[in-house]
Amino acid sequence: RWTRGITAVEPELIFNAEGVRPRSWTDLAGAEVAYLQDTGADLALARIRAEHPEVKWTPLDLASADALIAQVDDASIDYAVVMSSDVAIARNIHLSFDVAFAAGPKRELAWALPASQAKLRDSIDAFLDRMRRTGGIAQLTDRYYAPSRGLGRPDAGVLHDRIETVLPDLRKYFEEAQDESGLDWRLLAAIAYQESQWSADATSETGVRGIMQITEDTARQVGLADRLDVQKSISAAARYLRDLRDKLPARIAEPDRTWLMLAAFNIGLGHLEDARVLTQKMKGNPDLWNDVRKALPLLADPEYFAQVKLGYARGGMPVAFVQRVRSYYDILARALPPHVPRLRASTFDAVASP
């Protein structure tokens, strides 16, 4: 027996983009098409496999759909069928595969339970209803799928190239800033990429400068004399970000705390607080980024900015800023390992001594 549906997904045929895009199953006569055995894709393909015996169907026992997509991406496999939800997550990580066509109808993603577990199914259905009603499913969808929607593949390709060519010279500065601030070095790198594409001497028409695009006022606030000094700019920005994060109400949990910190970095803590006030007036949750981002653009609307303390602001900008940083961070976090600070000798000695 199935629980209520969570979200709609469909199986998709993917291929290596260096090859010829098939238009239908007829184009795949004699070709090998892989899929993950004992998964949703396996179930979704049951009828298709029976209707198209001319295709060489190959079930694989791999750890994840991402592992299968990676094999198509590096041309180890010509074709595969994976679910659209897995494609959405992987499309800016693996850049050499593409979707040829839908391999079956859309269906609701749900949990399967033994027929004897009616009580458990009812409990799960009640939980899913509550999650949908309170916005929990929308939050989870935003958390796991929003990063891949915020970036085009050409932009993702440029970032992948610069991870190899530019980032190695900067990485130590981001890691040092993590040691100082506690913020993931890959998040700091994502912010810097959004601000300057890792250009040390970037200068905007509004007067912000350097790799982190710090304003004069912020530079004075954090004691940064030279905004073009890469190491000091990254360190100063990390301290400033941590200060913004610490000023948010303690009850705000992750990952919303980080996304709200990013919005404050872009628009200022005061304007963010105005948006949170509007969020509450609109019966939203001011502690959830998914709700606050809907209120931020209203700061440019006279009907709404008249109701808040600081008035007008270009509230659409932090929404776009956070989305782009999340997209870059998603790629960096998948491509590069976290930084584990080394233990200082004195700390090691203290732990090792009897």
Listing of model-derived features with the role each one plays in the protein:
Residues R1, A46-R47, A70-P105, E273-D274, ...:
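A ligand-binding cleft/hinge motif common to bilobed small-molecule-binding domains
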Residues N16-D42, D86, P105-S148, L167-P168, ...:
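Extended ligand-binding regions for polar small-molecule ligands
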Residues Q37, D201-A225, V230-D243, D301, ...:
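Substrate-binding/active-site groove segments that recognize
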Residues S123, W259-I331:
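Catalytic and substrate-binding regions of cell-wall glycan-acting enzymes that process beta-1,4-linked
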Residues S148-W198, Q231-I234, L248-I252, P338-P341, ...:
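Export/targeting segments at the very N-terminus of extracytoplasmic proteins
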Residues V20, K56-Q71, D256:
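Short helix-initiation/N-cap motifs at beta->coil->alpha
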Residues W2-R4, A41-L62, R91-H94, G157, ...:
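Ligand-binding cleft/hinge of the Venus flytrap
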Residues T3-R21, S85-L128, L151-A156, T218, ...:
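Periplasmic-binding protein-like
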